[in-house]
Amino acid sequence: MALDYRKTFEIEIINEFQSAIHSKMLNYVLNNELDKSDSTNLQTNLLNQLSNMNQINLFKLSLEELEAYHEYLRSIKKYADSITRTT
């Protein structure tokens, strides 16, 4: 099995980034005492989506797919930032 250091690096970055977003959403849901099983709640839906995304085997994706996935996570982070912002 050949090592692809660029792909491995991208996977590590994605894993850390995804974990940070998940932690932010989990803290928000817990701090606001939201029901994690409430499918009508936007914040809990995003938390559940992030939890499900942790199950994806990133090593099966191509570098191009990883880069697209990373961009998707950037969009999710912007969205998570906007819905967890306190005034």
UniProtKB/Swiss-Prot annotation:
SUPFAM superfamilies: Plasmid maintenance system epsilon/zeta, antidote epsilon subunit (SSF81710). Signal peptide: none annotated. GO terms for molecular function: toxic substance binding. The keyword Transport does not apply. It holds the Pfam family Epsilon_antitox. Keywords: Plasmid, Toxin-antitoxin system. GO terms for biological process: negative regulation of cell killing; response to toxic substance. The keyword Transferase does not apply. It comes from the Bacteria. Belongs to the epsilon antitoxin family. In the presence of the zeta toxin, forms an inactive PezA(2)PezT(2) heterotetramer. Antitoxin component of a type II toxin-antitoxin (TA) system. Neutralizes the toxic effect of cognate zeta toxin. Part of a postsegregational killing (PSK) system involved in the killing of plasmid-free cells. Continuous synthesis of the epsilon antitoxin is required to counteract the zeta toxin. This is Antitoxin epsilon. It comes from Lactococcus lactis subsp. lactis (Streptococcus lactis).
